[in-house]
Amino acid sequence: MDGKALTASSLFDITGRVAVITGGGTGLGLMMAKALEANGAKVYILGRRLEPLQEAAKQSTHGNIHPVQCSVTSHADLQGVVDHIAAKDGYINLLVNNAGISTPNLGPHATRPTPKWDISKVRDYWFHKSFADYAAVFETNTTASLMVTFAFLELLDKGNKKSEEEAKASQARNGAGKARIEYVRSQVVTLSSVGGFGRDNSAFIYGASKAAATHMMKNLATYLAPWKIRVNVIAPGYFNTDMMGNFYKATGGRLPASLAPEERFGDAQEIGGTIVYLASKAGAYCNGMVLLVDGGYVSNKPSSY
């Protein structure tokens, strides 16, 4: 292999890739969309609210971020998006399951308990939470990732076939003979969370939904192997998102070393660089992986992974 193939411009080249990101109008979804698009990909961003998606698209580098209104918990919406992208491009190379919600209605007893707490109040606080609210967290954070993946399965498969044909044509032009055809295979990346690893917080349903999503994606990596579709997980720590915005403002983006050895929130370059790595030749050998992007948060919690 010559040196040119090992340069950053070759290793991380994603020119012409087609990506879909759920929850792509804000937060981590937007950070990843901008990074992919800035490096040559065409990116469809999905979300329930059209206005934030349209504003997000204005932040593109090359005018190649495309907003599509869609609820990830609606079969009809998902089918509509699949049909739209099939008509426009006919395939995708990357699906990022990023849409997520937090545990609703957290309050004074959503921290680590102490013996001073009135156990009757603790009981009432948790017992009277809504079953529907908690079910909605699993519906969005876990079930929807599976549904969205299967919705786009045929387009991911067509992405593989297109990449394989392009690789064959390239080999023929270069006189490579009948060497094995290699290409970057289609991929699903699901955003989990460090909250799915720890066991010392009280966001019970959120943490459980993210732990379930992580495990489910490992299952899916095995299930989709016959079609050569890869599945990986990114488990982010603290980033300045809608979900963590108030905490970011309160801390000025700084964290104690006991919480994260890097002592700060992650930024757009770090989550953006992660998704570009996974989408490119540099990350093409990754499958069934859980990648922690957390500034060391989980490493501070022994036996958590």
UniProtKB/Swiss-Prot annotation:
Catalytic residues (UniProt): 192, 206, 210
Pfam families for this protein: adh_short (PF00106), adh_short_C2 (PF13561)
Keyword NADP: yes
Description of the deletion phenotype: Impairs the reduction of the C3-C4 doucle bond in the heptaketide monomer.
Binding site for NADP(+): 28, 98, 206, 210, 241
GO biological process: one example: (M)-viriditoxin biosynthetic process
Key words, A-Z: NADP, Oxidoreductase
Annotated catalysed reactions: methyl 2-[(3S)-9,10-dihydroxy-7-methoxy-1-oxo-1H,3H,4H-naphtho[2,3-c]pyran-3-yl]acetate + AH2 = semiviriditoxin + A; 9,10-dihydroxy-7-methoxy-3-(2-oxopropyl)-1H-benzo[g]isochromen-1-one + AH2 = (3S)-9,10-dihydroxy-7-methoxy-3-(2-oxopropyl)-1H,3H,4H-naphtho[2,3-c]pyran-1-one + A
E.C. designation(s): 1.-.-.-
Transcription regulation in keyword set: no
Recorded metabolic or biological pathway in which this protein acts: Secondary metabolite biosynthesis
The organism's place on the tree of life at top rank: Eukaryota
GO molecular function: oxidoreductase activity; polyketide synthase activity
Protein family membership: Belongs to the short-chain dehydrogenases/reductases (SDR) family.
Role played: Short-chain dehydrogenase/reductase; part of the gene cluster that mediates the biosynthesis of viriditoxin, one of the 'classical' secondary metabolites produced by fungi and that has antibacterial activity. The first step is performed by the polyketide synthase VdtA which condenses one acetyl-CoA and 6 malonyl-CoA units to form the heptaketide monomer backbone of viriditoxin. The product of VdtA is then O-methylated on C7 by the O-methyltransferase VdtC. The O-methyl group is important for the stereoselective coupling of the monomers at the final step of viriditoxin biosynthesis.
PANTHER family tied to this protein: 7-ALPHA-HYDROXYSTEROID DEHYDROGENASE (PTHR43618), SHORT CHAIN DEHYDROGENASE_REDUCTASE FAMILY (AFU_ORTHOLOGUE AFUA_5G12480) (PTHR43618:SF18)
Name of the protein: Short-chain dehydrogenase/reductase VdtF
